[in-house]
Amino acid sequence: MMAFCALRKALPCRPENPFSSRCFVEILWVSLALVFLLPMPSDACDEPPKFESMRPQFLNTTYRPGDRVEYECRPGFQPMVPALPTFSVCQDDNTWSPLQEACRRKACSNLPDPLNGQVSYPNGDMLFGSKAQFTCNTGFYIIGAETVYCQVSGNVMAWSEPSPLCEKILCKPPGEIPNGKYTNSHKDVFEYNEVVTYSCLSSTGPDEFSLVGESSLFCIGKDEWSSDPPECKVVKCPYPVVPNGEIVSGFGSKFYYKAEVVFKCNAGFTLHGRDTIVCGANSTWEPEMPQCIKDSKPTDPPATPGPSHPGPPSPSDASPPKDAESLDGGIIAAIVVGVLAAIAVIAGGVYFFHHKYNKKRSK
């Protein structure tokens, strides 16, 4: 009834004649439109279920109860054993059944360990999508892919790359340096972990060469040494002088590479900086030279006056004792009382004399 009233308001029909032919036609059209727009109960299933291991062989646009969809295993998968249904049927309640995977992953072939190396399987198996990792023994390096994956190659299962090789680690000579040499310099190839040691030649000048850097190098990888070759050069730092200080350790007339000197300050001075310095590779002292700074003189505190011994006090300076102060107060009070009493006596005498005199005159 409410819908009918709404339609009456919406349609340009005369209120007094809602069932005219024109109004009836318009109501019919609106009703048909509502029928088509409102969702209708369906007797068809949705799209067939999707599986990781299977895919539909054929797809239709609609599926009614009883329709059946056949599945096949995807590449890299094969039917399970024992076999499970590889189809699904649209049921009367518009659902699909059965809903289960019916295929399993295929496996790649087992990989042998490379010579002087090993292979491992992080996923715990060699199934489709799994990976294998290769490592080489100490002193060997890998040539090829360290990680390979089990995948589909055409119609067969195969690993993504061929197995790598493990080759022995060898190093080329580390190189000559000016004013220096290294052990076993006659060799063209050095094996893994083999060491060479550098040293400096004797100088023809007044100062000896210093070896700056690592003296021993190790072959740690294919043509890779543990560090760059060192240098042989003259490193000489100037004589260290700290004003108001002195050297307590590291005395010498010349100070070469890594020479160490320790300072202390004279009495009345404080050391600012490090007390120990070292001659660096650039012929400079490291860290910076310390300084001896004069101690600041402490400010004398104000003198505290001590006990004094003055002479006998003058009468004007002497303070009266407390007893004297009390005595003076008592005397003043007595004087005041005495004066008042005398005034009272005199007043009484005057009154008595005046009264007696007036009495005699009256007689």
Swiss-Prot record:
Residues 351-363 are cytoplasmic. CDD domains: CCP, TM_EGFR-like. N-glycosylated. May be O-glycosylated. Glycans are attached at N60, T86, S296, T299, T304, S308, S314, S316, S319. Interacts with C3b. Interacts with C4b. Interacts with moesin/MSN. Broadly expressed. Expressed on erythrocytes, leukocytes, granulocytes, platelets, vascular endothelial cells and kidney epithelial cells. Not or weakly expressed in muscle cells and skin (at protein level). Pfam families: Sushi. Residues 1-44 form the signal peptide. It comes from Sus scrofa (Pig). It is a single-pass type I membrane protein. The chain crosses the membrane at residues 330-350. This is Membrane cofactor protein. The keyword Transmembrane applies. Residues 45-329 are extracellular. Residues 290-324 are annotated as: Disordered. Residues 45-105, 106-168, 169-234, 235-294 form the Sushi domain. Its main location: membrane. One of its GO terms (molecular function) is endopeptidase activity. Residues 299-315 have a biased composition (Pro residues). Disulfide bonds join C108-C150, C136-C166, C171-C219, C200-C232, C237-C279, C265-C292. SMART domains: CCP. GO terms for cellular component: cell surface; extracellular space; inner acrosomal membrane; membrane; plasma membrane. It is found in: Cytoplasmic vesicle, Secretory vesicle, Acrosome inner membrane. Keywords: Complement pathway, Cytoplasmic vesicle, Disulfide bond, Fertilization, Glycoprotein, Immunity, Innate immunity, Membrane, Repeat, Signal, Sushi, Transmembrane, Transmembrane helix.
